[in-house]
């Protein structure tokens, strides 16, 4: 992985990271280098939440970008998932607010969406509340297109979408990059 424009790169750890890792029957997706932290600590039998207790929001003052993480666990044709956001306390970097949302026995065709910011501002205001309910309809290409077209044009960079067959564990993935 490399930056689209290396001249704008200040802290590579905030830009270059593995956003997706698979550990057995668990798929881990994040917006930062905490992907590896979750993977490594869960591989040592720690939980998703325990792994995230070792991390905080990004150190990119004044925004202190929230770290968003998700994990999907598939077992014997059933699945559950959890999402987390680690963010500063209303822009105060001395405190980290930690929220985890867990979903057991999810309904087919339904999901949840969590994002980093709640619009524009200086500093950018962090996401608030519970993840938004979303309808997951159509095939992977239709869904990918719908999500990409609904992201803010000025702020979107990349999108990763994966459809996983719960019965077999087989999957299809799509990646969209604003800068090709």
Question: Residues of each region from the PLM?
Answer:
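Conserved short alpha-helical segments that host acidic/polar catalytic motifs at enzyme active sites
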Residues: 1-180
């Amino acid at each position: 992985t490399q930056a689209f424009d290396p001249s704008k790169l200040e802290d590579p750890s905030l830009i270059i990271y593995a956003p997706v890792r698979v550990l057995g029957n668990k798929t881990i997706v994040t917006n930062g280098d905490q992907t590896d932290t979750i993977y490594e600590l869960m591989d040592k039998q720690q939980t998703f939440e325990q792994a995230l207790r070792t991390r905080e929001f990004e150190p990119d003052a004044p925004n202190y970008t929230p770290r968003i993480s998700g994990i999907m666990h598939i077992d014997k044709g059933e699945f559950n998932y959890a999402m987390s956001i680690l963010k500063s306390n209303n822009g105060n970097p001395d405190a980290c607010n930690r929220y985890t949302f867990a979903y057991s026995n999810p309904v087919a065709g339904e999901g949840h969406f969590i994002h980093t910011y709640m619009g524009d501002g200086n500093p950018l205001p962090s996401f608030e509340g519970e993840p938004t309910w979303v309808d997951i309809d159509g095939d992977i290409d239709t869904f990918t297109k719908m999500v990409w077209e609904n992201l803010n044009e000025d702020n979107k960079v990349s999108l990763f979408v994966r459809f996983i067959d719960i019965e077999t564990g087989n999957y299809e993935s799509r990646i969209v990059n604003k800068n090709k």
